[in-house]
Amino acid sequence: MDRPITTLFMLMSLDGKISPGASDALDVDKDFPKIDGLKEGLPQYYEIEQTTDLWSFNTGRVQEKMGVNQKPYPDKTPVSFVLLDNNHLTEHGVTYFCKKSQVFVLITSNKDHPAYNIKENNLHIIFQEKLSLKDALRELKSSYGCNKLTIQSGGTV
């Protein structure tokens, strides 16, 4: 296979709705722990999340909602991150992921993305005039050795 094996990791309600990452009305990390009937299942969700692949795909939009553009820089983790983003991450947000990731790959169609101002050895940018996840997945495997990828994107990809 010329692309990574992908696993979709998501929260979904019984009526089939995906987590509220597609809107700003609710935030999984801030609001779900306060909702009776939902908060009881969160420990299981986070426990399973820790067993996912060492490559994680998400979006800049979701990460902006989680506050990475302002959060203090984290310690390095064993996880490599792939983010799809055109205009949600700031230079601070990009640097946040460089500090956190073994390898950080940004997929963008924005020629002026703030990531182009960051000089970190583990930062790689896949520029695409028109987004093609198929081509991006192939490049992740061939250029960066990504064999397994967990996708968590708040229902927006």
Regions found by a protein language model. Name each.
Residues T95-Q102, L106-T108, A115-Y116:
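A mid-sequence interfacial segment
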Residues M1-K100:
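N-terminal nucleotide/polyanion-binding subdomain common to many enzyme families
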Residues P78, V103, E120-N122:
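A generic structural signal for alpha->beta connector loops
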Residues I5-M10, K111-V157:
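A glycine-rich beta-strand to alpha-helix segment
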Residues L83-D85, I107-N110:
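Short beta-strand/turn micro-motifs composed of small residues
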Residues F81, L106, H124-I125:
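Conserved beta-strand scaffold positions in the cores of enzyme catalytic domains, especially
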Residues W55-S56, F104, N147:
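Conserved acidic residues
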